[in-house]
Design a protein with these regions (language model features):
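Beta-propeller-forming repeat regions
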Residues: 17-494
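Bacterial Sec-dependent N-terminal signal peptides
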Residues: 1-21
Length: 494
């Protein structure tokens, strides 16, 4: 069933004084598979239109011949694909490894999956292999890899290297305290996959968080990482990259903690929230405790608890009110995982945590928001994916599931909700949409994923659809938060 494109951009059409219409450029359907990944873009075939890279999967523990997908941005046709033994849920890190002036792909997934792929053809450059069961740190690096971020070249080969977290025994039941092993933060050579440094979480706890790297105003290479999970408490840490290189994460400072039986899962973000020229840090715990940390003193600027909710969703960062301080948007889940029963959207003033906007649209999900000023009024709209069904059934119910997936834009000035797309019988639990200028024509494009809902199981896969929507919105300012972990794919707002 083809999507229904609604008139989100009809008002924008007149506001931007253009005759261009919003339209569906293409949709590509894949049977059997789904995805927990979010799209990234590179121009693979050098036709002037960026192409799409994303991970894909079947259900857990099942191998897949189409585990990483490269799609032509013009047509949606498959350019290349590669296999994996389990789910590839990471979103790609893009860096030229081979020296051919084309970006290559580093992408992660479940049970130790981490590969570097030639961006031109998908051939494996290197593949992580778990080999060390004796080393007290590396023996725990057989679990899940999360999104990597680029860091400065550490081994003087002229190529940026990667910072990445391994952890999370997915076979451990929610109440299992025995089979939970310390997460391991790693620096790896992006060219060869060699481990350059690794150390365990300072508190010895598990980790599911993609790390953050930034260089401070004072020239310090900071790394930010978290511990804990849905049912076990944890901390957010800040350390220097040198601490990790020296295997000395015990020097890390705890900058946020959650003692309520929840850890830190969603990736943190970085922006200047107090206008002092220093990069600050914002994080959200699984119990929906939001903390903003001063990047100069590493002290708390403000905290806000969203009661009776949980969160594994990261933020979008943008201009959501009239001041000049970046603000935060996310959505959190009502109820207790895995019986999450609804979703709450919140926008917070980056300066003090005061509420700009809240609503309760759709049911729970794990994707994240993106934002752009669609109507040129100086305040960014937020674009999110929501699923509408009987939210009270939770994730594990075996009751009948009638579901509709929607892509919507929220006007944070008027609180109006405008619908971009709706598809009945489809869902999107995990994937964050991408907004970009795919063909560099000066107009906003949207890349968006949906998954066929074939039975009662919200989390299973049996077919996916990827869409490119061409909008009538003329790009007048840089897209500053256009995808998962931001436009730069690194969690930093600039």
């Amino acid at each position: 069933m083809r999507c229904l494109l609604y008139l989100l951009f009809l008002i924008l059409l007149f506001a931007h004084c253009t005759t261009r219409k919003t339209s569906l450029v293409w949709e590509q359907n894949f049977p059997v598979i789904g995805s927990q990944s979010s799209p990234r873009t590179i121009d693979i075939n050098h036709d002037g239109t960026d192409d799409i890279i994303m991970g894909a999967c079947k259900n857990e523990y099942i191998s897949n011949d189409q585990a990483v997908l490269a799609l032509d941005g013009k047509s949606g046709n498959l350019l290349w694909t590669t296999d994996a033994p389990d789910q590839v849920y990471g979103s790609a890190t893009l860096v030229d490894i081979t020296g051919d002036n084309n970006k290559d792909v580093i992408i992660s997934g479940r049970w130790g999956y981490l590969r570097a792929l030639d961006g031109q053809n998908g051939k494996t450059i290197w593949n992580y292999t778990y080999t060390d069961s004796i080393d007290p740190i590396l023996k725990h690096t057989k679990f899940n890899f999360y999104n990597s971020v680029l860091i400065p070249d550490q081994n003087r080969d002229g190529i940026e290297d990667i910072l990445i977290q391994n952890g999370g025994n997915h076979r451990a039941a929610p109440d299992d305290s025995i089979h939970r092993y310390p997460g391991v933060l790693m620096v790896m050579d992006s060219k060869s996959g060699k481990i350059l440094a690794a150390d365990s979480m300072p508190d010895g706890k598990e980790s599911y968080m993609s790390p953050l790297y930034f260089k401070s105003k004072n020239g310090i290479d900071y790394i930010v990482f978290g511990s804990g999970g849905e049912t076990y408490n944890g901390h957010l840490f800040v350390a220097t990259l040198t601490d990790l290189i020296n295997k000395n994460l015990k020097n890390a400072k705890i900058v946020a903690t959650d003692a309520s039986g929840h850890g830190y899962i969603a990736p943190p973000v970085a922006a200047d929230f107090n206008n002092d020229g220093h990069t600050d840090i914002a994080c959200i715990s699984h119990s929906s405790k939001i903390t903003v940390i001063d990047g100069n003193s590493l002290s708390t600027l403000w905290e806000k608890q969203i009661p009776n909710t949980e969160s594994s969703n990261s933020f979008s960062v943008g201009k959501y009110n009239d001041d000049n301080i970046p603000d935060l948007f996310t959505f959190v889940s009502k109820g207790v995982w895995p019986q999450s029963t609804g979703s709450v959207q919140i926008a917070l003033n980056g300066k003090d945590g005061s509420l700009i906007y809240t609503d309760s649209l759709g049911c729970a999900g794990f994707s994240s928001p993106v934002s752009y000023d669609l109507n040129n009024d100086g305040i960014e709209e937020v674009i999110i994916s929501i699923n509408e069904y009987d939210c009270n059934r939770g994730y594990t119910s075996e009751s009948l599931l009638q579901i509709t997936n929607k892509l919507i834009a929220i006007n944070l000035k008027t609180h109006q909700v405008q619908q971009i797309d709706q598809t009945n019988g489809f869902k999107n639990i995990y994937s964050t949409p991408l907004i970009c200028d795919l063909d560099h024509d000066g107009y906003l494009d949207i890349i968006y994923n949906q998954y066929y809902s074939h039975n009662y199981d919200l989390l299973s896969f049996l077919g996916m659809r990827i869409k490119r929507i061409q909008s009538s919105v003329k790009i007048k300012e840089n897209i500053r938060w256009g995808g998962y972990m931001g436009t730069l794919n690194n969690g930093i707002y600039k």
